[in-house]
C-alpha cells in the first residue's frame, strides 16, 4: 500500500544520500573514464539512485491510480495530491501531515449528509444523489468518464465480469476497506455488458460474466447452482446461495479466506466506489427500493449485502472514526411503484391527498 511504499523509500533515501556523495567523489577522481573496466564500481554507486527513481515512479503511479485501477475513475493529478486543500484520505493518520509532498486529508471533511437513492434492478441499476441541491444520476463502469454523456449511461447494467478469480479473491478476502482490486481482474456494469454483447459466440467469455445479479439473489439453497469461470485460468467457482450477512452496527467489517464470494456485495462495492469518489464526497446514508412482491427474506439478504459492499467502499481512516461508522445506514425506503409515483406526480402536476396511499 501507499504507506508501505513510503516506508521503503525512507531506507532508499538514506542510501541515496551516501551514493550522491560517492558519485561526486567518483566523478571528480576521473575514475568514470575507466568504464567499462570500472563497471562494477559504477553500478555499485548508481544502484541506489536507480532504485530511488523506480520507487518514486512506482509510488507516483500507485497514488495517481488509486481510483482508476479498481473502478476506472479518472486518474488523480499531481496537483490534486499536492494541493493544500486536496490530498489523500488514505494517508490520514489522525493529524495533518505531508508525505513526500502529498497531503494527508481527513475524510471526515468530505462527509455529505444527503442520502443516496439506489434502485437495484434486474437488468440495470440507477443511482441518484443530491449534489448541493442539484439531483444527479451516476454512471458506473463506463469506458471513458470524459466522453459525452448519454441517457443510457445512467442505466448501469447489473453485471460482473470475472477475468482473474484467484487474483480477485486474494485481495477481496484480505482487505476490508477499499481493497485495491484491479479492473483487469474484475469488471462491472457497462464494460462487462459491452464485452458480453461483442463476444456472444465466445463461450469462455460468456461463462465469466454474471448477468442479472438480482435474479441470482432469488435462488434458494435447493435450486440449481450457478457456476462462473474466469478468463485467465478457466478457474470454475460455484456461487453459494445468497445468505444473510449483516455487518454489526458500529463495528468494523472483518474479512477472511472463508468468506463466500457474494456478487451482490461486490456489485454494491463498485457502486460505492463511484458514489464515494473524491469529486462526490463520502456518503453514509443509502435508501433502496424493491418490487412490491419481493420476499421479505430476500430483501433482507440484499440489504445486508449492500451494507457490506457500500461500507467497504469507504476509506479506512473514516470508518476508524467511530462516530461516522455509527451513522452509516442502508435502508429500504419505498417500493418501486411508490418511488416511481413520487417522481412522476410532480411532473404531472399531481399532489397526494393521503400520505399513506403513496408510500
Write out the residue ranges for each language-model feature.
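Conserved phosphate-binding loops in N-terminal lobes of ATP-dependent enzymes
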Residues: 1-57, 156-294
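Conserved phosphate-binding catalytic cores of ATP/NTP-utilizing and phosphoryl-transfer enzymes
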Residues: 87-112, 320-356
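Gly/Thr-rich phosphate-binding beta-strand-loop-beta motif of the actin/hexokinase/Hsp70
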Residues: 107-137, 345-359
Amino acid at each position: 500500500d501507499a504507506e508501505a511504499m513510503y516506508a521503503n523509500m525512507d531506507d532508499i533515501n538514506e542510501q541515496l544520500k551516501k551514493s550522491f556523495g560517492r558519485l561526486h567523489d567518483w566523478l571528480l577522481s576521473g575514475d568514470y573514464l575507466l568504464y567499462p573496466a570500472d563497471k562494477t564500481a559504477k553500478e555499485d554507486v548508481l544502484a541506489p539512485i536507480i532504485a530511488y527513481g523506480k520507487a518514486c515512479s512506482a509510488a507516483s503511479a500507485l497514488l495517481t491510480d488509486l481510483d482508476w485501477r479498481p473502478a476506472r475513475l479518472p486518474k488523480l493529478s499531481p496537483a490534486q495530491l499536492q494541493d493544500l486543500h486536496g490530498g489523500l484520505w488514505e494517508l490520514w493518520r489522525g493529524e495533518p501531515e505531508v508525505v513526500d509532498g502529498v497531503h494527508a486529508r481527513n475524510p471526515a471533511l468530505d462527509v455529505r449528509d444527503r442520502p443516496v437513492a439506489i434502485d437495484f434492478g434486474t437488468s440495470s441499476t440507477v443511482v441518484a444523489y443530491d449534489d448541493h441541491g442539484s439531483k444527479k444520476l451516476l454512471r458506473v463502469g463506463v469506458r471513458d468518464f470524459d466522453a459525452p454523456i448519454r441517457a443510457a449511461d445512467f442505466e448501469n447494467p447489473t453485471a460482473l465480469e470475472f477475468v482473474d478469480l484467484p487474483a480477485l479473491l486474494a485481495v477481496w478476502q484480505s482487505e476490508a476497506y477499499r481493497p485495491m482490486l484491479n479492473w483487469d481482474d474484475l469488471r462491472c456494469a457497462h464494460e462487462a455488458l459491452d464485452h458480453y454483447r461483442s463476444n456472444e459466440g465466445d463461450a469462455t467469455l460468456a461463462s465469466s460474466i454474471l448477468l442479472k445479479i438480482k435474479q441470482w439473489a432469488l435462488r434458494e439453497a435447493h435450486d440449481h447452482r450457478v457456476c462462473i469461470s474466469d478468463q485467465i485460468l478457466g478457474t470454475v467457482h460455484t456461487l453459494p446461495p445468497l445468505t444473510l450477512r449483516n455487518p454489526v452496527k458500529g463495528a468494523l467489517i472483518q474479512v477472511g479466506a472463508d468468506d463466500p464470494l457474494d456478487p451482490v456485495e461486490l456489485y454494491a462495492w463498485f457502486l460505492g466506489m463511484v458514489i464515494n469518489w473524491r469529486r462526490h464526497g463520502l456518503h453514509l446514508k443509502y435508501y433502496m427500493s424493491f418490487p412490491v412482491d419481493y420476499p421479505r427474506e430476500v430483501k433482507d439478504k440484499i440489504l445486508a449485502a449492500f451494507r457490506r459492499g457500500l461500507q467497504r467502499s469507504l476509506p479506512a481512516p473514516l470508518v476508524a472514526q467511530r462516530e461516522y461508522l455509527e451513522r452509516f445506514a442502508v435502508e429500504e425506503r419505498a417500493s418501486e411503484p411508490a418511488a416511481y409515483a413520487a417522481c412522476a406526480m410532480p411532473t404531472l402536476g399531481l399532489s397526494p391527498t393521503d400520505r399513506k396511499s403513496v408510500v
